[in-house]
Amino acid sequence: MVSNLENACLSSHYVYCPGRVCLFGEHSDWAGGMRRFNPDIPVGRTIVCGTNVGIHARARTLPTMLTVQSTDETGGKYGPFSVPMEPAALLAKAQEGTFFSYAAGVAYHMLTHYRVGGLEIDNFETDLPLKKGLSSSAAFCVLVARAFDRVYNLRLTVRGEMECAFAGERLTPSKCGRMDQACANGNRPVVMTYDADFLAVEPISISEPLYLVLVDLRAEKSTVRILNALQGCYPVATTAEHRNVQHALGIGNLDITSRALAAMEAGDAQQLGAIMDESHALFTAAGSAVCPEELLAPVLQRVLTHPLIRPLVWGGKGVGAGGDGTAQFVCKSLAAQQELVRLVESELKMHPIPLTIEPSTTVRSAVVPVAGFASSLFPATKVVSPPLFPICDRDGVAKPAILIVVEELCAAGFDKIVLVLILTYKETYKETYRPKRDR
């Protein structure tokens, strides 16, 4: 007969990570990182927001293996793939360059930095388009890091998940920058600044909803070819074409992101759309000179200038690395967003993804009274305070009720949480929230 404790250990944890859309500043993340070799290069800056589509998975412990089964956006199944949870085996698998390599790279990092065992990940649903500039690979890396965190109760912060995911991805042949791990922040817009190895992440407060539509162009592009061409212009520019690329990703990008940030905070969608058009023109002019086969992007250009689309939008640009992957538009209204979705499906036979960036909440602090006694729970309350009653969470782990409440508040974006309690239970609450490393 299986005990309750064994059931809890065998239970799976639901894990989710969205994709991300870079509104402005593509490629400036790795370009800013080049300051390690050339301090004359300007810092990089991106404006990023999570998507409302992503990767869904269940995760549970395994003794000695990493096993992953994945599902793409069409419902196609891949795997399961398995590798021993050993450093040499994980590193070799990470360097192969397959989609499974991302999981192996992150697992290698987790194994060498934390006390973890094996893991089984069942990616049972994916509604995030793959290889379309929405950071599907980075989302998968964050998902794996998050799965280790949930299953082994590592208590990583969002920033910690991002760092683990990036470290794991860098063990693969991928040349993506740090921006992609912004998908760990959920659908909250953030501005990210890159100065060599330093990364700053700040949330953006907007006053009015912004109605966007992402369009999967259902065409082909090579991110590897684009990155090879653009990164060939660094760290020192040797030709006029190289200098134009460094300007577009440097000084030009800082100017565009500064004005875009101001427009977002003011809720000025019209100005934001105009800046998108300007940003697209700047990047295309510089990028297509060094990678014309990818960055001239005829499908993208046709969609951005489509006569049925332009009356509905304030502006638009490419997404991610660029090329014929995904387009994004700032719509004039909610009705325009809905009409654009219909038009893209019926007329262009492409896949639209509506994305609404809501105004930031003004409530950032929560006060939770935990000093009361529930008479209906007597005499159990003689032993433990009601907020400390054990409740089985959806991940199958029994936790104090107040811990579940605080986790939900943290997930909702509250910066400060105050518990009002009886002094008798002060030490109990301090022990509940004391970091594991201090125990």
Predicted regions and their residues:
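Short glycine/serine- and small hydrophobic-enriched flexible loop segments
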Residues: Y108-T112, R146-R150, A262, E407
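Acidic, glycine-rich active-site loops and adjacent beta-strand->loop/helix elements
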Residues: V21, P63, D72-T74, N123-L130, ...
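Beta-strand segments within the central parallel beta-sheet cores of soluble alpha/beta enzyme folds
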Residues: Q69, G118-F124, L156-G168, A274-I275
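Glycine- and acidic-rich phosphate- and metal-coordinating loops
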Residues: E86, A107-Y108, H113-K132
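N-terminal glycine-rich phosphate-binding loop and ensuing alpha1 helix
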Residues: S360-T432
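Short, aromatic/basic amphipathic alpha-helical patches
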Residues: E339-V344, K430-D438
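C-terminal nucleotide
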Residues: M1-T46, G54-S101, H109-R115, G168-R170, ...
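DPxDG-like acidic metal-binding loop motif
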Residues: L134-L154
